[in-house]
């Protein structure tokens, strides 16, 4: 599973000042970038993240994060996208349910209409959102790293997304905190926890199994992530390239 990408989440300054025990950057300077590399170590993209909005705090809250991606050889303007996160008792994870909120679906509809050179009316958007929601069913959640990691096993998770007659299932198994390591990247040197898991994705007649090994640092978030195929071959690496403090 693609890394996930990012971990630019912000929270109230009071919570941050009292106890910076979160796997996210400082909300006042939350802008950072990752290098995406293939299995041979060649850079395929640079992705820049920044916090667009935040509600609640890093214990229990949510965040909308903007990311911009451009291929190494591309001279075109990077496309802007958003990903949604939630904090649950200090653990942050991708909030898949947020993608199906009315305002988010409205943004997708506007983007699709704009690509066709048309503009949807508010009534048309409302009708489209209602029809989409009738076809969607979401259950479970994609778990992240706990606020206070302890070396040992972590709970498994399962996320199921149904759209009409299509079902996609994502399972995280063999999850564990396997150790600690000081890791150096272009952004600096960080004391990290190492998290490992096997991610199995099923959609229609296809099944994909990947193992991820991820390094997380307090006050930063994801520092590095290696993804391996089911045979143990390295297929991609995500590496922290820069961060504003």
Name the predicted role of every residue range.
Residues 2-11:
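Bacterial N-terminal signal peptides
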Residues 3, 18-19, 88:
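N-terminal leader/targeting signatures
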Residues 11-17:
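Sec/Tat signal peptide C-region and signal peptidase I cleavage site
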Residues 25-27, 84-190:
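Solvent-exposed helix/loop surface patches that form functional interfaces
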Residues 18-83, 156-245:
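Acidic, serine/threonine-rich low-complexity disordered tracts
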């Amino acid at each position: 599973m693609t890394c996930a990408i990012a971990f630019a989440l912000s929270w109230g300054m009071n919570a941050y000042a009292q106890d910076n025990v979160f796997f996210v950057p400082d909300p006042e300077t939350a802008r950072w970038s990752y290098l995406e590399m293939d299995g041979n170590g060649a850079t395929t993209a640079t992705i820049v993240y920044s916090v667009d909005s935040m509600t609640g705090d890093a214990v229990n809250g949510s965040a909308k994060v903007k990311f911009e991606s451009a291929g190494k050889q591309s001279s075109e303007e990077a496309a802007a996208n958003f990903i949604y996160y939630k904090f649950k008792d200090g653990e942050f994870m991708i909030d898949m349910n947020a993608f199906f909120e009315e305002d988010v679906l409205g943004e997708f509809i506007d983007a699709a209409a704009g690509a066709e050179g048309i503009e949807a009316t508010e009534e048309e958007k409302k009708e489209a959102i209602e029809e989409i929601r009738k076809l969607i069913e979401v259950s479970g959640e994609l778990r992240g790293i706990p606020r206070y990691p302890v070396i040992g096993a972590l709970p498994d998770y399962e996320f199921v997304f149904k759209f009409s007659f299509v079902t996609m299932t994502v399972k995280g198994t063999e999850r564990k905190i396997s150790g600690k390591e000081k890791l150096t990247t272009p952004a600096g040197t960080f004391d990290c926890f190492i998290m490992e898991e096997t991610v199995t994705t099923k959609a229609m007649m296809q099944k994909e199994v990947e193992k991820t090994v991820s390094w997380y640092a307090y006050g930063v978030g994801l520092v590095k992530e290696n993804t391996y195929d089911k045979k143990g071959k390295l297929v991609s690496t995500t590496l922290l390239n820069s961060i504003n403090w």
